[in-house]
Amino acid sequence: MTNTTVLNKAADNIRILAASIVEKAKSGHPGGAMGGADFVNTLFAEFLVYDPSDPKWINRDRFFLDPGHMSPMLYSVLALTGKFTLDELKQFRQWGSPTPGHPEVDVMRGIENTSGPLGQGHTMAVGAAIAERFLVARFGDWMAHKTYAFISDGGIQEEISQGAGRIAGYLGLSLIHISEPTRLQLIS
């Protein structure tokens, strides 16, 4: 199998897991999670620098999920890396579950931020990139790492997100934003 074939199959597994856990919970948003599967799989498989045996490694790259309702995508890719079990995924959105509807920070399991209101994850990513800039200035290039953020078109519309984006651009931060614009808000 080619590397592309493996990546595509892994992304399909993320889609299947994401849709399955939302269906089992009878609650959640499967669309965004399924749409972001290719991105998150490629990020974790090809670009994100981290040490699974040392989740708090100071030089790890950071990934911030702004739209918390896309948590099925994050939980699914983390399950493929061994951070969540299938039984834990089946508890999605249940009271006291390790997989709530919006992720809560748990660096040991690969979750860098608690996702709440849209724009919050975006601003946390900007803050992490500012911290990375400080660490490099203070301790040297060996502290350099990348910060990634997945932001939604709805999140970009939030003023807090717009302000964070302006600051990030002004400071020229080592920050990579990924957005999958649907040009569509939640429809009922």
Show where each model-derived region lies.
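Active-site phosphate/pyrophosphate-handling residues
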Residues: 17, 38, 185
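N-terminal capping segment at the start of a domain
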Residues: 11-27, 179
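Basic/polar N-terminal segments that are highly enriched at the extreme N-terminus
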Residues: 1-8
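Conserved phosphate/pyrophosphate-binding and hydrolysis machinery centered on Walker-type P-loop NTPases
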Residues: 30-33
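Short coil/turn segments at secondary-structure junctions
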Residues: 2, 23-24, 111-112
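Cofactor-binding active-site loop characterized by glycine-rich and histidine/acidic residues
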Residues: 35-171
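Single conserved hydrophobic/aromatic residue that forms the stacking wall/gate
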Residues: 176-188
